[in-house]
């Protein structure tokens, strides 16, 4: 397997360097400048498209081919070792490979920051959340970090009056998958243009006509895989809703990870975990999982899926502690990029900070530092977008509830057409034409 990862790394490096060579060629720069000189004659979407082309070119110019090639190979190796380390529940198995990725990412951040006139971490952040910098995030995250503990404690106190009954039993992955597929279809995922598979960590990849959603099933927890699959369905619906007339153009792509995450979190946290959706889902749950008794009633399922609880796993977190999970990762990755934290010490740093942020210490590396693959594949400055995405999701949801009549009734009936149309019109169909701030303001007032 390790040999295959090296081969895959070579292939990815070849593709990355070829794309880089095309973007940084003098011909592309000449064409961009020629188009810029004629900007007065361009339509609005073409001006936005040119802006995105220039942005891609500028980011590419900062990177030498050799660094791109080394990073592609390093992340391919680290990803394979991460999967093995997670299975073995032993961070030491991936630590040296992650250290290589971190070192190369530091070099990349420094070069990118120098070229763009940004702090190294801000330069990485700008890739995932264009226009959003730490100067704006730090006060927001500081406020969240200060207020979250009391909000969590208040919720825990309120829950004590009516704690949810646990779901007991074991549920075959095939039955869980069937439930996921039926729910995804109802929400609008087209299985003639995509599919659902299993993986160590859930993700969504692909293009508009071929979207791949994955999830991970736990036999003792039938809602673990379901919530992950429907979270990823939010990502997929966003990709499907991007403007078809601008397909394959930079302006027709995602506006950034914060907006993408807002769509997955809106679907999972606001729609799927709601009482109306669980009312709609209940017959499917009965059909595929076969549960019976008070624990399987809608009221209990609602309390179960909305309860605030300390979990070491981000993917199992509720809407309050999810933000604490994200802040933990933001703290650690900034230390990694700045050089204040060595990759070799990451596991202990994670466990110690988890006690502060989450009030719980992971029992193993698998439920601690190894639960996400993002850093192994080089995705640094990715997690701040999760926090922003959660906040954007709440803003959009409030606007939707104000504008869509009988939203709860429609969801309970399994009618998601009006909801999906609102999102396509106000979010998905905008593509990268507007920046995130302008898009959210236009959508919410």
PLM ranges: what are they?
Residues 7, 67-70, 97-100, 140, ...:
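Secondary-structure capping and boundary motifs in well-ordered enzyme cores
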Residues 7, 326, 330-444:
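C-terminal, non-catalytic "cap/extension" segments appended to globular domains
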Residues 66, 71-222:
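Contiguous, non-catalytic segments that form substrate-binding/exosite surfaces or channel walls
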Residues 253-294:
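Post-HExxH zinc-binding segment in Zn-dependent metallohydrolases
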Residues 113, 217, 221-244, 261-268, ...:
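Active-site recognition of the HExxH zinc-binding catalytic motif
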Residues 1-130, 433-435:
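A well-structured
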Residues 141, 145-148, 173-178, 183-197, ...:
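All-alpha helical catalytic cores of prenyl diphosphate-utilizing isoprenoid enzymes
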Residues 192-193, 245-249, 273-283, 343-344:
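Acidic/polar loop patches that form or flank catalytic/metal-binding clefts of enzymes
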């Amino acid at each position: 397997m390790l040999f295959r990862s090296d081969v895959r790394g070579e292939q990815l490096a070849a593709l990355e360097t070829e794309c880089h060579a095309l973007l940084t060629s003098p011909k592309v720069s000449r064409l961009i400048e020629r188009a810029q000189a004629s900007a007065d004659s361009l339509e609005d979407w073409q001006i936005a498209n040119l802006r995105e082309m220039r942005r891609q070119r500028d980011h590419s110019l900062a990177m030498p081919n050799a660094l791109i090639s080394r990073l592609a190979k390093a992340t391919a190796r680290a990803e394979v070792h991460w999967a093995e380390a997670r299975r073995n529940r032993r961070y030491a198995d991936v630590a040296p490979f992650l250290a290589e990725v971190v070192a190369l990412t530091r070099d990349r951040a420094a070069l990118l920051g120098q070229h763009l006139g940004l702090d190294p971490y801000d330069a990485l952040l700008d890739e995932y959340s264009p226009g959003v910098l730490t100067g704006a995030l730090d006060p927001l995250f500081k406020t969240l970090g200060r207020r979250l503990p009391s909000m969590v404690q208040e919720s825990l106190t309120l829950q004590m009056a009516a704690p949810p009954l646990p779901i007991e039993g074991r549920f075959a992955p095939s039955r869980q998958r069937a439930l996921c597929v039926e729910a995804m279809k109802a929400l609008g995922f087209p299985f003639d243009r995509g599919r659902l598979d299993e993986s160590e960590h859930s993700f969504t990849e692909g293009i508009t006509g071929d979207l791949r959603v994955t999830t991970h099933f736990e036999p003792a927890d039938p809602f673990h895989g379901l919530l992950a699959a429907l979270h990823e369905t939010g990502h997929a619906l966003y990709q499907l809703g991007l403007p078809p007339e601008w397909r394959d153009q930079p302006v027709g792509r995602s506006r950034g990870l914060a907006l993408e995450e807002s769509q997955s979190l809106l679907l999972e946290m606001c729609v799927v975990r709601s009482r109306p959706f669980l009312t709609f889902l209940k017959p499917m749950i009965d059909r595929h999982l076969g549960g019976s008794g008070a624990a399987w009633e809608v009221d209990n399922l609602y309390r179960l899926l909305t309860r605030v609880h300390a979990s070491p796993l981000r993917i199992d977190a509720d809407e309050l502690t999810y933000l604490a999970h994200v802040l933990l990762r933001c703290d650690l990755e900034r230390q990694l990029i700045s050089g204040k934290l060595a990759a070799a010490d990451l596991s202990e740093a994670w466990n110690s900070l988890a006690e502060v942020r989450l009030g719980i210490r992971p029992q193993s590396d698998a439920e601690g530092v190894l639960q996400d693959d993002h850093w192994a594949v080089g995705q640094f400055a990715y997690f701040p977008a999760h926090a922003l995405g959660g906040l954007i999701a709440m803003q959009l949801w409030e606007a939707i509830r104000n504008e869509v009549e009988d939203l709860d009734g429609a969801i309970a009936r399994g009618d998601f057409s009006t909801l999906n149309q609102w999102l396509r019109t106000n979010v998905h169909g905008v593509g990268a034409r507007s920046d995130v701030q302008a898009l959210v303001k236009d959508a919410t007032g």
